[in-house]
Every structure is written in structure tokens, then in C-alpha cells.
């Protein structure tokens, strides 16, 4: 397997332009997410460079742009807030938080190495929509304090909501005006201009220039980013807290899993735009390496970013070279122009992050979820509430569990209709003319027990119900020829029906056992109780043998009609 991503120079012009355009979009977003996370603008920039570089170089989606994203920032905010509060010093807490980022990267590398990529996006859409919308709401709520010109209160979402009256009573008009103006520019900028220059960059530059002249740094106490240190970052030594180690593992797992989902969903978008197919397992390894190195050098966690990826593709990017160009451009900005960011108002960055939060919310599905599926809508709303008020991992776990239970119930109900007991040819089941003849000759003493389709554990109840409803008989023909897969629970229910029939000294025939179904029954040792001459591949032959076993005199002079379907 090729170690690096797909890189060639046949599309060098498109890749360079795509990378440059993606870098222009990434700059304001990285600054905003760095500040929003609590780690600072510098951490956001280095996260954009390092995650973007290593994910592009070693990932499995050639056009994917990786950087700090809204969902990852929400989790990072909680991680940083917790460990800076619980550690002996804020610096130690920040080191632990960056260690969690490294651990999240290791988790992603493990997920990719175990080839779990294909399972990540098999989550029900109601759950994905719910937790993404919940993350969007969290990001919006967390920006309320800086949006209103004040420092964020502790306690995350709950703390912000509890302090909302205080925040509103101490509103800073100048900073709030800058934040509102930022949102207005991004929201209402004409589409024809958006295609030329990203509205986030326009809002960042205009907001900074206006603030510089209206609120001069020398005389105003307007909150700004402050100077970002030029040069390469220092290595962050991994720091572990024995008391908090369990919390570190859990946070790293959540961050890693969210990064996997975020990246692979964006990879699917990239596939649809480029008509290619990504390598999900390779992508997870690339994302993991990106987050590992980002944490190692004091950057926040990142994942595949939909906006940057789409812009990269639309600008001509087709290989991983575009992602590498983007990372190089951002590196040049950090090393050569870091001082220019010192006067950027925090309110402008809050406005950018606020708009990202609004965009993350799945408005399209929220508006029509109740029309598509009331149960699905309830799952989505439940996941949103749990994400916002409890915990992301709890929200996803509960959402997936409930969605799967409902799906299993629907599948079981559909498959239960394919569990039938037939006593005569008048029953609603397709039989050949010969099979109908033999079933009629059985005079109700021979029953055909037919199963078809995959038999999951939810069908066990239907098998037991049909078996219990059987009338008195002398022979049972179990037809499983149309069962491609049989789960453990369903096979045990079938075993129980066969064992009970044998205990009552009834003749038992098994028809059509093949493939996985046969192997399952062999493991249950059923074929030791049902002799080979009664394990047949032909339903007609099984019915004939069952009838003749009860009425041997019918063997004399019996003529078998043709076998066309009735």
C-alpha cells in the first residue's frame, strides 16, 4: 500500500491555486477557533498547519483540507477548560490538554490500522444530524460572551446560560457592533463576490481596520488577540495526570472519534465533487498523524473541513499537493506576518465562530424531520439536547442505541412475515404443482415450516410463535433454502422448534441448508439428531418422503405431475 497520499504534478496549476484559496479561508477560521478553544490564536494557526500538512501527506482523500473545525473546537474548549481548572497551574493544564490531542491522534491511527473506517459513517443520519446540530448550538452559545464584549464565564454551556443576565447587563456596545458587523458581512455578502474572496477574510480585515481607527489601541481597552510569537513552536512534552488519566482517555477517545466522523463525512463530500473514492482507513491514519504532531507542537485538534475542501476542489485542486501548498502558505504567514494579527479584535473572531456555529446546525433536516419520520425527529431532538446539556459521547451512544432498536424492530416485523407454517396447498405460499400435490396428500399431518430472507435475532419471537401455533402433525419440513444468513438467536429458536418436534417423535426434514446457514446449524450439532437422509436440498423430495413416511401405501401407483409453479 502506498504510504503517502496521491501526489503528482500533472495538475500543478490547479493544485497551487486550490491550496492558496484554501489557505485564505483557513487563516481567519484558524484564528477564530484558536481563540474560541481557549488555547489562543497561535494554537489555532499551528493546528491548521500541522493537521493540514500531515493529513494531506499521509491521508486517503487527495483533495481533503484538514484544519481546526467547529465540532473539534467545541470538544477542545471543554477539554482545555477542564484541565486548566483542575491542574496545579494553567500552563500544566494546557500541556495536559495538548497531550489529549496527541492521544486522540493515536486513537485515530489505531482506528485506521484496524480498518474501522468503513464503520464510522454507518451511523444513522438522525444521530449525525442531531449531534452536529448540538455542536453548532454549543459553539453559538460559547461565543455569546465574547460577542457581547466580555470574557467567557466558566462552566461551558450551562455556565454561559446561567450568566446570560449578567452578560447582557454588562454589554460592550463597541465590541458587540463589531461582532454583529462581522456576522452581517459573512451572511449578506453577494454570492458573486464570495466566489472571488472569502467573506470571512473580508470581515476579518474590515473589522480589524475599523477597530484600529475607531478604537485606537493606544487609548482603547478593546479586547484584541495580542501579539503572536513568530518562529517555530516549542515542543510540548506529553504530560499525564494520574488523577485525571481516565478523563484524559475518555476525552481523547471522544475527540478522536469525532475527528474520524468529521473527516470521513467531508471525504464523502469530496468524492461526490471529484467522482473519486477515498481510502477511509488511510485517511484516519493521516488524520491521526496530523493531530499527534499538532498536539506535540501546541496546536489544537483538527479534522476534514467541508468549506476548505469544497473551495479547494472548486479552485482546481485535485491532488494532495493542494493541501501541502495550503499548509506551506499558512506557515509563511505565521513566520513572516504574525505581528500583523496583534490588533485583530476578539469580537470579530467571535462573530466568525458564531456564524460557523449557525452553519453547522442542520437547518434543512430540522425543518422537515417531523414530516419525514416522527420517530427519527424525536431521536434527533433527543441527541441535540443530550449533546448540549449532557455530553457528546452520551448523546451519540443513546442516539445510536435507540435508532438501532427501532431499525431492528422494523426489520424483525418485515422478516417475521416470511416465517410461515403451511398445512395445505390453499395457504398463501408459492409451491410447484408437485409440491402442492404432496402437501394435499399429507391430509394436514405434514406441515411445511418455511423461512426466507436474513433471520436476525428479532425474528426468533416469530419462529417461536409459529411453532407454538402449530396443530398436531406427524412430520415437519423446515425449509430454509431462501435464508442467506441466520443469526445466533434465530438459529437457537429454530433449534428449539426442531428439538421439540423430535422429542414428540415427529419426523423432521431440513431443506436447503447451505452456506452460512448450514455452518451455523452444524455448530449447533443439529445434523447429529437429524439424519442425512432427512437433510435434503429439494423441498419436493422432502414433502414426498414425509408423506410416504406416514402413508406408505401412496407409493403404489403415484404419478408425479409436472413441476411448473402454481
UniProtKB/Swiss-Prot annotation:
It holds the Pfam family Sulfate_transp. Residues 1-15, 64, 115-126, 191-196, 269-318, 362-371, 415-566 are cytoplasmic. Residues 436-546 form the STAS domain. The chain crosses the membrane at residues 16-36, 43-63, 65-85, 94-114, 127-147, 170-190, 197-217, 248-268, 319-339, 341-361, 372-392, 394-414. One of its GO terms (molecular function) is metal ion binding. InterPro entries: SLC26A/SulP_dom, SLC26A/SulP_fam, STAS_dom, STAS_dom_sf. Hydrogencarbonate binds at residues 69, 305. Induction: Induced by CO(2). One of its GO terms (biological process) is bicarbonate transport. Its main location: membrane. Keywords: Cell inner membrane, Cell membrane, Ion transport, Membrane, Metal-binding, Sodium, Sodium transport, Transmembrane, Transmembrane helix, Transport. PANTHER family: SULFATE TRANSPORTER (PTHR11814). Belongs to the SLC26A/SulP transporter (TC 2.A.53) family. Low/medium affinity, Na(+)-dependent bicarbonate transporter. This is Bicarbonate transporter BicA. It comes from Picosynechococcus sp. (strain ATCC 27264 / PCC 7002 / PR-6) (Agmenellum quadruplicatum).
Amino acid at each position: 500500500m502506498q504510504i503517502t497520499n496521491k501526489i503528482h504534478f500533472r495538475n500543478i496549476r490547479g493544485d497551487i491555486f486550490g491550496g492558496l484559496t484554501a489557505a485564505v479561508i483557513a487563516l481567519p477560521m484558524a484564528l477564530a477557533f484558536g481563540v474560541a478553544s481557549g488555547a489562543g490564536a497561535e494554537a489555532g494557526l499551528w493546528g491548521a498547519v500541522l493537521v493540514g500538512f500531515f493529513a494531506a501527506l499521509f491521508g486517503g482523500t487527495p483533495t481533503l483540507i484538514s484544519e481546526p473545525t467547529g465540532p473539534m473546537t467545541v470538544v477542545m474548549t471543554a477539554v482545555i477548560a477542564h484541565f486548566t481548572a483542575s491542574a496545579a497551574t494553567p500552563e500544566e493544564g494546557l500541556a495536559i490538554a495538548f497531550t489529549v490531542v496527541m492521544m486522540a491522534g493515536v486513537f485515530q491511527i489505531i482506528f485506521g490500522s484496524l480498518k474501522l473506517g468503513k464503520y464510522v459513517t454507518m451511523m444513522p443520519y438522525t444521530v449525525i444530524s442531531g449531534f452536529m446540530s448540538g455542536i453548532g448550538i454549543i459553539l453559538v452559545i460559547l461565543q455569546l460572551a465574547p460577542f457581547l464584549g466580555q470574557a467567557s464565564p466558566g462552566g461551558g454551556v450551562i455556565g454561559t446560560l446561567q450568566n446570560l443576565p449578567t452578560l447582557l447587563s454588562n454589554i460592550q456596545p463597541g465590541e458587540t457592533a463589531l461582532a454583529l458587523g462581522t456576522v452581517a458581512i459573512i451572511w449578506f455578502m453577494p454570492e458573486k463576490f464570495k466566489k472571488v474572496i472569502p467573506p470571512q477574510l473580508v470581515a476579518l480585515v474590515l473589522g480589524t481596520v475599523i477597530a484600529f481607527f475607531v478604537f485606537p489601541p493606544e487609548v482603547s481597552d478593546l479586547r484584541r488577540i495580542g501579539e503572536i510569537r513568530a518562529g517555530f513552536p516549542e515542543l510540548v512534552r506529553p504530560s499525564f495526570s494520574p488523577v485525571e488519566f481516565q478523563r484524559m482517555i475518555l476525552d481523547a477517545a471522544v475527540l478522536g472519534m469525532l475527528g474520524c466522523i468529521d473527516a470521513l463525512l467531508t471525504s464523502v463530500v469530496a468524492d461526490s465533487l471529484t467522482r473519486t473514492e477515498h481510502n477511509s482507513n488511510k485517511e484516519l491514519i493521516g488524520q491521526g498523524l496530523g493531530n499527534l504532531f499538532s498536539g506535540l507542537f501546541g496546536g489544537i485538534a483538527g479534522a476534514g473541513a467541508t468549506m476548505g475542501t469544497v473551495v479547494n476542489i472548486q479552485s482546481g485542486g485535485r491532488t494532495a499537493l493542494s493541501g501541502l501548498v495550503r499548509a506551506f502558505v499558512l506557515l509563511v504567514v505565521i513566520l513572516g506576518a504574525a505581528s500583523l494579527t496583534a490588533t485583530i479584535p476578539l469580537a470579530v473572531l467571535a462573530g466568525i465562530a458564531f456564524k460557523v456555529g449557525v452553519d453547522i446546525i442542520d437547518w434543512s433536516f430540522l425543518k422537515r424531520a417531523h414530516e419525514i419520520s416522527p420517530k427519527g425527529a424525536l431521536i434527533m431532538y433527543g441527541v441535540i439536547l443530550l449533546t448540549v446539556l449532557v455530553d457528546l459521547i452520551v448523546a451519540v451512544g443513546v442516539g445510536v442505541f435507540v435508532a438501532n432498536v427501532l431499525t431492528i424492530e422494523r426489520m424483525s416485523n418485515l422478516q417475521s412475515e416470511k416465517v410461515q407454517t403451511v398445512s395445505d396447498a390453499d395457504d398463501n405460499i408459492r409451491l410447484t404443482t408437485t409440491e402442492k400435490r404432496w402437501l394435499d396428500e399429507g391430509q394436514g399431518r405434514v406441515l411445511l415450516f418455511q423461512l426466507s430472507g436474513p433471520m436476525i435475532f428479532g425474528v426468533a419471537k416469530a419462529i417461536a410463535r409459529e411453532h407454538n401455533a402449530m396443530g398436531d402433525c406427524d412430520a415437519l419440513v423446515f425449509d430454509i433454502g431462501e435464508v442467506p444468513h441466520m443469526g445466533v438467536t434465530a438459529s437457537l429458536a429454530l433449534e428449539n422448534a426442531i428439538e421439540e418436534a423430535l422429542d414428540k417423535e415427529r419426523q423432521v426434514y431440513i431443506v436447503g441448508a447451505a452456506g452460512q446457514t448450514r455452518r451455523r446449524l452444524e455448530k449447533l450439532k443439529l445434523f447429529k439428531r437429524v439424519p442425512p437422509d432427512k437433510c435434503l436440498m429439494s423441498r419436493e423430495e422432502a414433502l414426498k418422503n414425509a408423506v410416504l413416511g406416514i402413508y406408505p401405501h401412496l407409493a403404489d401407483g403415484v404419478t408425479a405431475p409436472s413441476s411448473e409453479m402454481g
